[in-house]
Amino acid sequence: GSPLGLSGTVTSGIVSALNRPVTTGSTNAESYMDAIQTDAAINPGNSGGPLVDSQGRIVGVNSAIATLGSSFSATGSIGLGFSIPFNQAQRISDELIATGKSTKPLVGISFDNTYTGVGARVAGITAGKAAERAGMSVGLIVKTIDGFKIYDLITAIVRIRSHAPGDQVTIAAELPTGGTKTFIFALDSAPALP
């Protein structure tokens, strides 16, 4: 990296968590990512660089940090860094190189952002998309996706976005009438992004 113009800089740290649902500062669903959490310093100039394991294999692409904000004395890296998992970054870069565009997975669900229970409540289903074809309906509360516990709508969005279009997902949901049901289906593709 080259933070503050200091070329050849390397930082070290440990991976604290995998599959950490984080947002990059906006409440727009596009800003949610499935991240690797690390305490390796990420500063302007070395974000976008690789996160490597002890054998030099790339495991992620450094992309964001948590900060205390300008109202606190500490700014910059505080030991909470986030990297995009390499398999996700590689899929997108391969698409961009091949087609000039990238795709993202689409399930065809909107979630209720006022729901405060554990899980993500389905507020809307897009006609003709994967969720409707699988039999999902409004009012379901998504509890797990591929075995990962869903705590809220952010966790649900991040779990879906960790996949590629066409991947098969398994969603377990609580029915409005009680009980649970499992839905297994392939994800659709959202329109390509330039």
Give the location of each predicted region.
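Active-site loop architecture of trypsin-fold serine endopeptidases
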Residues: 1-14, 19-93
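C-terminal recognition in membrane/secretory proteostasis and scaffolding
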Residues: 40, 54-58, 67-68, 81, ...
